[in-house]
Amino acid sequence: MAERANDIRPGQVLEHNGGLFLVVSIMHTQPGKGGAYIQAEMKNIKTGAKLYERFRSDATIRRAILDEEEYIYLFTEGNIVNLMHPSNYEQITINLDLLEEKKIYLQDNMRIKVVTYQDKIIFAHVPDYVRLTVKETESFIKGQTITSSYKPAVLENGMRINVPQFIKEEDKIVVYTPDDSYYERVKE
């Protein structure tokens, strides 16, 4: 789909120079002399190589038309992830590398979004919010601080994050997966 370069947003996938590129970040620039332009940091989906490209604001770019479907995570066997479609029960397998560093969040029956381009799987996403149990953390000492502060914690999947002082071992928390940060304590 053809669009103006001014409409590029992070997270979009572009067809550029014969390949597919994920837009990582953009910066609009209006120099004192000359026309405005967009500086885009992009990642080649196939190779993972970064590309920094400059587009004139009025240039035409091609956004890739992607299909996105939700699947249910079943199990992982080696480097292969087995997923099932929730309505027709069709099972597919994807390479674990498609999840990149987010594979640590995989849990039974988790909903995984699989993105395809021309019937070829290009990447997969875990949900933005995942519930996990705190396995280890330091105890809270009342009056320890007057400002909000965080302490390290180890979660059930082995991941280490910073959590607020009031979180105890065995508490269930929600983690925001895009930046691997504490979001909230689960209210039961």
Swiss-Prot record:
<comment type="pathway">
    <text>Protein biosynthesis; polypeptide chain elongation.</text>
</comment>
<keyword id="KW-0963">Cytoplasm</keyword>
<dbReference type="InterPro" id="IPR011768">
    <property type="entry name" value="Transl_elongation_fac_P"/>
</dbReference>
<dbReference type="InterPro" id="IPR013185">
    <property type="entry name" value="Transl_elong_KOW-like"/>
</dbReference>
<comment type="function">
    <text>Involved in peptide bond synthesis. Stimulates efficient translation and peptide-bond synthesis on native or reconstituted 70S ribosomes in vitro. Probably functions indirectly by altering the affinity of the ribosome for aminoacyl-tRNA, thus increasing their reactivity as acceptors for peptidyl transferase.</text>
</comment>
<dbReference type="GO" id="GO:0003746">
    <property type="term" value="F:translation elongation factor activity"/>
</dbReference>
<comment type="similarity">
    <text>Belongs to the elongation factor P family.</text>
</comment>
<dbReference type="GO" id="GO:0043043">
    <property type="term" value="P:peptide biosynthetic process"/>
</dbReference>
<dbReference type="InterPro" id="IPR001059">
    <property type="entry name" value="Transl_elong_P/YeiP_cen"/>
</dbReference>
<dbReference type="Pfam" id="PF01132">
    <property type="entry name" value="EFP"/>
</dbReference>
<protein>
    <recommendedName>
        <fullName>Elongation factor P</fullName>
    </recommendedName>
</protein>
<dbReference type="InterPro" id="IPR008991">
    <property type="entry name" value="Translation_prot_SH3-like_sf"/>
</dbReference>
<keyword id="KW-0251">Elongation factor</keyword>
<dbReference type="InterPro" id="IPR012340">
    <property type="entry name" value="NA-bd_OB-fold"/>
</dbReference>
<dbReference type="GO" id="GO:0005737">
    <property type="term" value="C:cytoplasm"/>
</dbReference>
<keyword id="KW-0648">Protein biosynthesis</keyword>
<dbReference type="InterPro" id="IPR015365">
    <property type="entry name" value="Elong-fact-P_C"/>
</dbReference>
<dbReference type="Pfam" id="PF09285">
    <property type="entry name" value="Elong-fact-P_C"/>
</dbReference>
<dbReference type="InterPro" id="IPR020599">
    <property type="entry name" value="Transl_elong_fac_P/YeiP"/>
</dbReference>
<dbReference type="InterPro" id="IPR014722">
    <property type="entry name" value="Rib_uL2_dom2"/>
</dbReference>
<dbReference type="Pfam" id="PF08207">
    <property type="entry name" value="EFP_N"/>
</dbReference>
